[in-house]
Structures are given as C-alpha cells and as structure tokens.
C-alpha cells in the first residue's frame, strides 16, 4: 500500500477487502470506498494524508458534540475541507488537470488508512462511522446535480420505482407525508428500515414494510446506504487486523492515529521570542488555558515544579514568546527555595536545552492537547497533564468557579458532562466560550494551549 526505500508491502497488507489489483479512477468527488487503494505511496504520504483527514473528522466530531446548528456545522466542514482535504469538481479539470485526480486519490487513501486505525475497538468504529457519514452527507448535498446523479447511477441501488398508477392509488397519503406539492414528484420504494430518519420524521408513507421515498429525499437513503456499507467494512477490517500487526512499520503509525484526533499544529504560529518578559507572565495568566493556569498556580504555591510540569509549562511559556534569557529569569525568581548554585547545576542546562541551545540543539515546540493527554501519568507531587482529565469532579467545579463559571450553571454541567464522556478538548473549548462570551461559539475546537492563549488575547 505504501512504498519505502527498502521494500514493498502492498501484497502483505492489501486486505482492506478482497478487491483485485486494478487501476482506480475517480469520475466524481463522491466515493463509497468499496475498492481499496492498491498502488504504492510513501510513508510520508501515508502519515500526512491520514493526519489531514483525522483533523477533518476531529473538527466534525467536535462540532457535533458542541451541538452546532446545521448551518454552523456546514460552515465548519467547508472551512476545514478547503484547508485539509480539498476536492475540485469535474468542471475544474481543464484547469487542474492531474492534480484533480491527486486530490481524489488522497481522499481515497486517507479514508482507508483511518479505517485501519479506527477498526480497533467498538468505540473507535462508532466514532469513525459517525464522522465519515457526516462528511459524506455534506459532500453529497453540495455536489453538483449532474455529478451526484452519475454517482447514484454507478451504485446500482436497485431502487424500485413507483409507477404513476401506484402513485395515484396512494396520492393523498403520499401528499400528507411529503408536506409539499407532489404533482411533479417521482417516488421510489425501499424497505422502511433503510430510511430510519425519514420514518422517524414521518416524512415518508409506509405500506407493507416499504417506505415510499420522494426523489427529493434521496439524500437520507444514500447516506443510510453509505453507513451500512461502511459499518460492514469496518467489521471486516477488524477481523483482519491481527495479520496487519505483523508489519512493524505500519503498527506504530496506526496506533498513533487511533489514539485520538491530531492537533493541526501548522495552523498555530507562535509569537516571536521576546514578546513577553519574565515580569509580565503573571499579567497574562488570565489568558491561559486551565492546564497552564494550573501549573502556574502550583509553581506559585510550591515555589517548584517537578520535571514533567517544568517541561510542559516551560515549553508553553516559550510558545507564547518568553525568550531563553527571560525564561532563566522567570524560573530563577520562581524557585525561591533553591540556591543559585543548585539552580545553575540542576535547572539552567535543561531550560537552555528546550530552546535548542544545549545537547542535540533541537528547538522544541510546546505540547499540543493530544501530547498532553497521552503524556506520562501523574506521580506523587506531579502537576502536568490535562486538568480536565486529572481533576476530580469537585476540583474541576471549583476551578471553573474560580474562572467565573457558577457551579449550578448550565455551562458548568455541560463541561462536566463532556469530561465524563472523555471529550476533554470539547470541555476546554466550552470553557473558553463561557469565559469569553463576546467571542461566541468557536468554529474550531481547542486543540493546543497556544491556540487558547492567542484566541483569548484577540478577544
């Protein structure tokens, strides 16, 4: 499926399904992903394409969990697709040429890569299915009429058309369920369980186990077919995963992808070093996310932070513009119980190391939310990590109260419910919205402490 400089691994890991090796074409932007990709791609493409799609699905899931309206959700999907997974219509072929097929190829491969990653548990499969179905619905609704019809024709659904005679027999009932003029409307019928949302809304007439679906409601039926197809494919993929575990190059990547939605770090630009001084840090704390605020408070209280806390907080301060010289001043003043000699011996080197001035000279970046969530577990005296994950409910409610979110408020309950469901980035996003009412609802969820800080400063 992908290439390396050493060997091919296509044959060994081709079991997305039993499809034969054949050239795949993409006549439209819509895809039921029935045929797996079989040509080689590089490991870099494998990872990059998967991460781009992961970000798209992550924003879709976030928007749905935050109860965005239909219009808000569509706006979020369009924005993130244009940035991460754009696909042009056939009308652009004369302009884009081969790049149009490359866009569709990336979409095809990235779906199957994530299908592998998210087939590993029932919970992951459900999340993947929900997000992919929402993405497909958006694309289907917004596709051009001619391309949409060409796609439907290619699927051979074998829908049973309703004759004019049958339509006349049930005309009044069809009219009542459609709630529109059906004089020029055509209908087809399918088993009622194929369109549960239409049945629930009473948008179709049901007779002898068949739902009479107006052509204008075909979206629901097509999406239902997509979901059913993908659900079966995920179950099939799950059964073949043990064979995939034999490849020690694929496994680490897939494990990483399945841990959660990856933060789109490239969208976050850190301020120039020197933007703030050591003496100004306290005045910026009100703009910190809870993770950084907690570390700052522990540092003030204990005059010290353990290793992982220093690393997490130090890199955050670096991200927001604290230079290495100012960082040395900040930490020296904070560690009031430490002698000058001990500070120089035990802490100075590590601070300079994070700025790329010692050791391997690597210039480290601050941790994103996923890295914080999957970092080292807390030990005695530790303060690093994500408070939404590590705090007890009582401690979380107290922390929210200190930020102006009343314990008995609907907002507090929303945050607590998100935490209980382990949607920590949703909880953080909701806290931002509640503490920045002038900003309103965020289009994208919080996925990086620096993102929170920058949005707060701009508000």
Swiss-Prot record:
Query: What are its GO biological-process terms?
Result: DNA replication initiation; DNA replication, synthesis of primer
Q: According to the record, how does the cofactor bind?
A: Binds 1 [4Fe-4S] cluster.
Q: Quick check: keyword Iron-sulfur in the entry?
A: yes
**Family that this chain belongs to:** Belongs to the eukaryotic-type primase large subunit family.
Q: Where in the cell is it found?
A: Nucleus; Chromosome
Q: What does the function comment of this entry state?
A: Regulatory subunit of the DNA primase complex and component of the DNA polymerase alpha complex (also known as the alpha DNA polymerase-primase complex - primosome/replisome) which play an essential role in the initiation of DNA synthesis. During the S phase of the cell cycle, the DNA polymerase alpha complex (composed of a catalytic subunit pol1, an accessory subunit spb70/pol12 and two primase subunits, the catalytic subunit spp1/pri1 and the regulatory subunit spp2/pri2) is recruited to DNA at the replicative forks.
Q: Which UniProt keywords apply?
A: 4Fe-4S, Chromosome, DNA replication, DNA-binding, Iron, Iron-sulfur, Metal-binding, Nucleus, Primosome
An example molecular function term from Gene Ontology annotations:
4 iron, 4 sulfur cluster binding
Q: Which GO terms describe its cellular component?
A: alpha DNA polymerase:primase complex; cytoplasm; cytosol; nucleus
Required cofactor names: [4Fe-4S] cluster
What quaternary arrangement does the UniProt entry report?
A: Heterodimer of a catalytic subunit spp1/pri1 and a regulatory subunit spp2/pri2, also known as the DNA primase complex. Component of the alpha DNA polymerase complex (also known as the alpha DNA polymerase-primase complex) consisting of four subunits: the catalytic subunit pol1, the accessory subunit spb70/pol12, and the primase complex subunits spp1/pri1 and spp2/pri2 respectively.
Looking up Pfam families in the UniProt record yields:
DNA_primase_lrg (PF04104)
Q: Which residues bind [4Fe-4S] cluster?
A: 291, 369, 386, 428
Q: Which SUPFAM superfamilies match?
A: PriB N-terminal domain-like
Question: Which species is this UniProt entry from?
Answer: Schizosaccharomyces pombe (strain 972 / ATCC 24843)
Has the keyword Ribosomal protein been applied to this entry? no
Family matches, as InterPro entries:
DNA_primase_lsu_euk, DNA_primase_lsu_euk/arc
Q: What is this protein called?
A: DNA primase large subunit
């Amino acid at each position: 499926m992908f290439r390396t400089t050493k060997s091919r691994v296509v044959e060994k890991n081709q079991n997305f399904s039993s499809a034969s090796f054949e050239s795949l074409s993409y006549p439209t932007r819509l895809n039921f992903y029935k045929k797996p990709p079989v040509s080689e791609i590089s490991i870099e493409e494998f990872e990059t394409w998967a991460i781009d799609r992961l970000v798209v699905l992550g924003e879709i899931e976030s928007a749905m969990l935050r109860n965005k309206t239909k219009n808000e959700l569509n706006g979020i999907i369009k924005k993130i697709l244009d940035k991460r997974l754009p696909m042009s219509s056939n009308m652009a072929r004369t302009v884009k040429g081969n790049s149009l097929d490359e866009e569709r190829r990336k979409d095809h491969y990235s779906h199957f890569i994530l299908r592998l990653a998210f087939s590993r548990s029932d919970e992951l499969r459900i999340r993947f299915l929900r997000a992919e179905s929402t993405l497909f619905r958006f694309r289907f609704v917004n596709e051009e009429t001619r391309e949409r019809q060409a796609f439907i024709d290619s699927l051979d659904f074998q829908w049973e058309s309703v004759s004019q005679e049958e339509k006349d027999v049930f005309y009044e009932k069809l009219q009542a369920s459609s709630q529109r003029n059906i004089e020029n409307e055509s209908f087809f019928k399918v088993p009622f369980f194929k369109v549960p949302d239409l049945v629930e809304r009473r948008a179709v007439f049901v007779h002898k186990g068949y739902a009479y679906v107006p052509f204008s409601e075909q979206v629901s039926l097509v999406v239902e077919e997509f979901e059913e197809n993908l659900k079966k494919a995920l179950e099939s993929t799950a059964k073949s995963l043990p064979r995939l575990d034999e490849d020690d190059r694929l496994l680490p990547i897939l494990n990483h992808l399945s841990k959660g939605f990856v933060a789109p770090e490239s969208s976050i630009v850190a301020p120039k070093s020197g933007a703030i001084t050591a003496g100004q840090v306290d005045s910026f704390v009100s703009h910190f996310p809870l993770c950084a605020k907690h570390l700052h408070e522990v540092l003030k209280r204990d005059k010290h932070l353990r290793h992982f806390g220093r690393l997490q907080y130090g890199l955050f301060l670096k991200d927001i513009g604290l230079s290495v010289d100012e960082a040395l001043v900040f930490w020296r003043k904070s560690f009031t119980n430490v002698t000058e000699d001990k500070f120089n011996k035990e802490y100075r080197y590590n601070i300079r190391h994070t700025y790329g001035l010692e050791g391997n000279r690597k210039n480290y970046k601050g941790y994103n939310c996923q890295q914080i969530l999957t970092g080292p577990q807390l030990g005695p005296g530790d303060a690093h990590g994500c408070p939404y994950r590590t705090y007890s409910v009582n401690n979380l409610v107290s922390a929210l109260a200190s930020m102006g979110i009343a314990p008995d408020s609907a907002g507090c309950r929303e945050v607590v419910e998100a935490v209980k469901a382990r949607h920590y980035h949703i909880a953080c996003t909701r806290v931002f919205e509640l503490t920045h009412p002038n900003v309103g609802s965020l289009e994208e969820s919080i996925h990086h402490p620096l993102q929170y800080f920058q949005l707060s400063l701009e508000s």
